[in-house]
């Protein structure tokens, strides 16, 4: 399917600004961004629940802008399970097929097949009140699966689940997509969900596309400071300062603190830039001294919160770190992993 220069305006206020995404058959695409970025609005336009102001939605090579949702051959799973409390799991899953006038034998067969995929066979005769949150969400997915759509749409389906169940359901949805080999578009504000589930991620901000790419592309080569700060947990450190050229170029903060570079930077002497380094790309020791504020250990790793002058930084280390707060702490960036961004535009400097 294709999203071609799609926009949404409410009067003079444009909230989606010409978004274009080409999605090959069978791809798992995640729309991610902060609250209010337009990801759910875009999904609703794909579903036909929200009119398009301009642009085209193409499914299976056909423009579907004016088709009602029921004729687009899509199935949607919402944050709310929206199950009928007085119907069994089997009846909930097969309800849309019943409304379409499908034969009972066909409905039963498709419900059974979906239930086998989702491990719901033992629960087919139960009612929603007798199920856990994860089981209810699987019923909602089963209701979509039985329709055998060309495209699945997920609108923050895991938001109502606790942390442990979210991890489990992430894996189940990804496995479901692999088994069905059907195109899926998934909306979330959680970048961890995006990183762990997507074939490709579309990062949105204020109704505009900031970057499209595989999870590792976005992580390793963010296009700008927004993507750099949004993708990754903890997020990338962005330290403001200037490039200092010469025989051995380096980065210098406004307070005169120097950070190393590898080779000649793609920026002229004195150019204001952001020096980007992910927390796990600091090395213990070296010549850089930060002022330690907090040390947090999870057992498997240690997070070090510190300051370079007035700018906050975070380092993540596999080693156990024993250090006292308010003391100088040696942590040096791995220069091979440094990113530079233009301080004015925020764009990546290669």
Where does each model-flagged region fall?
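Pre-Walker A (P-loop) beta-loop-beta motif of ABC nucleotide-binding domains
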Residues: 19-30
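Conserved ABC transporter NBD signature motif
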Residues: 54-63
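Non-catalytic connector elements of ABC transporters
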Residues: 234-238, 246-350
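Helix-to-loop junction immediately C-terminal to a conserved catalytic motif
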Residues: 47
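ABC ATPase nucleotide-binding domain
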Residues: 2, 22, 58, 330-332
């Amino acid at each position: 399917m294709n999203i071609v220069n799609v926009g949404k305006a409410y009067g003079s206020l444009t909230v989606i600004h010409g978004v274009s995404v080409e999605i090959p058959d069978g791809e798992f695409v995640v729309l991610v961004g902060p609250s209010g970025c337009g990801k759910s609005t875009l999904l609703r336009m794909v579903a036909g629940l929200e009119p398009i102001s301009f642009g085209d939605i193409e499914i299976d090579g056909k423009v579907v802008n004016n088709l009602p949702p029921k004729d687009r051959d899509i199935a949607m799973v919402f944050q709310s399970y929206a199950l009928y409390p007085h119907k069994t799991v089997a009846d909930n899953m097969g309800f849309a097929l019943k409304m379409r006038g499908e034969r009972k034998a066909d409905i039963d067969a498709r419900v059974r097949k979906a239930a086998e995929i989702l491990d719901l066979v033992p629960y087919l005769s139960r009612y929603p009140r007798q199920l856990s949150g994860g089981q209810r969400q699987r019923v909602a997915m089963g209701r979509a699966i039985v329709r055998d759509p060309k495209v699945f749409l997920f609108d923050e389906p895991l938001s109502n689940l606790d942390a442990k169940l979210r991890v489990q359901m992430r894996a189940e949805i990804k496995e479901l997509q692999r088994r069905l080999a059907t195109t899926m578009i998934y909306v979330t504000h959680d970048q961890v969900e995006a990183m762990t589930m997507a074939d490709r991620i579309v990062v949105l901000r204020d109704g505009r596309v900031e970057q499209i790419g595989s999870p590792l592309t976005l992580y390793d080569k963010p296009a700008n400071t927004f993507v750099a700060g949004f993708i990754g947990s903890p997020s990338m450190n962005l330290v403001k300062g200037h490039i200092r050229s010469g025989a051995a170029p380096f980065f210098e903060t406004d307070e005169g603190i120097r950070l190393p570079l590898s080779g000649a930077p793609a920026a002229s002497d004195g150019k204001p830039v952001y020096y980007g380094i992910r927390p796990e790309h600091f090395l213990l020791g070296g010549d850089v001294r930060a002022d330690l504020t907090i040390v947090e250990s999870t057992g498997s790793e240690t997070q070090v919160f510190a300051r370079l002058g007035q700018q906050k930084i975070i380092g993540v280390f596999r080693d156990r770190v024993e250090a006292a707060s308010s003391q100088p702490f040696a942590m040096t960036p791995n220069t091979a992993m440094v990113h530079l961004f233009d301080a004015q535009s925020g764009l990546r400097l290669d």
